[in-house]
């Protein structure tokens, strides 16, 4: 009787694994279909990294989310005045879109803004990043990193107002220095850098990185070694 009960448990467990496998494979099929442009860019880059985005939304599997490009993103830390100034005066004139309203992701896992999920932009996208600026909000308030931003009040929110007191020449210097720090190419280095990358996309997926055991390893192999017979499979 005991052995039969144990056998029943194994059968139930096996059925649960089969159901999970079908669900995960269905999710991966959907993401690879909707995000094929992004996945092809990752493969071409050979960066062998994933990008992550933190979210306070909770999901055991994945969520499809809409970006704030049309409505404008409400900044979590940076003041709205500074946020708008960066878009209007620095990023839009160079890249043609409000970079600070983009969807931010990084190859570095950052749990400060919620649970880190694997990030997949859907459809075509544009991106902007900096080889020197890891996180613009952090760097804007760190004198040692942006020495040209030398005039601001001690309280971080006052930065937006103290900048208004700069001369036109000083503002132009600030704008040019920031513009020169950003670029919209070299996707391989952008992914490898662990710096923030702003994506211009309409929709994107956040995928639970603990969906299965070693799920990140599974995704890395599926993306970067699609033809390999020895690629990792969490269900075997």
Residue ranges and their predicted role:
Residues 1-3:
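Classical Sec-dependent N-terminal signal peptides that target proteins to the secretory pathway
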Residues 53-60, 107-110, 120-125, 193-194, ...:
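Short, flexible beta-strand-to-coil junctions
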């Amino acid at each position: 009787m005991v052995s039969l009960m144990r056998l029943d448990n194994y059968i139930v467990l096996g059925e649960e694994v089969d159901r999970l496998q079908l669900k995960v494979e269905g999710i991966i099929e959907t993401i690879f279909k909707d995000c094929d442009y992004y996945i092809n860019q990752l493969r071409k880059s050979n960066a062998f990294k994933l990008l992550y985005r933190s979210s306070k939304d909770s999901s055991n599997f994945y969520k499809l989310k809409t970006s704030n490009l049309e409505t404008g993103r409400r900044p979590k830390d940076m003041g709205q005045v500074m946020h708008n100034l960066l878009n209007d005066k620095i990023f839009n004139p160079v890249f043609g879109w409000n970079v600070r309203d983009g969807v931010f992701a990084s190859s570095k896992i950052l749990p400060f803004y919620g649970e880190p999920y694997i990030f997949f932009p859907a459809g075509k996208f544009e991106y902007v990043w900096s080889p020197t600026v890891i996180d613009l909000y952090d760097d804007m308030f760190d004198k040692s990193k942006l020495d040209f931003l030398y005039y601001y009040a001690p309280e971080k929110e006052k930065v937006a107002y103290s900048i208004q007191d700069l001369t036109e020449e000083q503002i132009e210097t600030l704008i040019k220095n920031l513009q020169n720090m950003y670029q919209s190419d070299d996707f391989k280095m952008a992914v490898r850098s662990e710096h923030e990358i702003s994506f211009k996309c309409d929709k994107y997926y956040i995928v639970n990185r603990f969906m299965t055991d070693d799920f990140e390893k599974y995704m890395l192999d599926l993306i970067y070694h699609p033809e390999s017979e020895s690629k990792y499979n969490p269900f075997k």
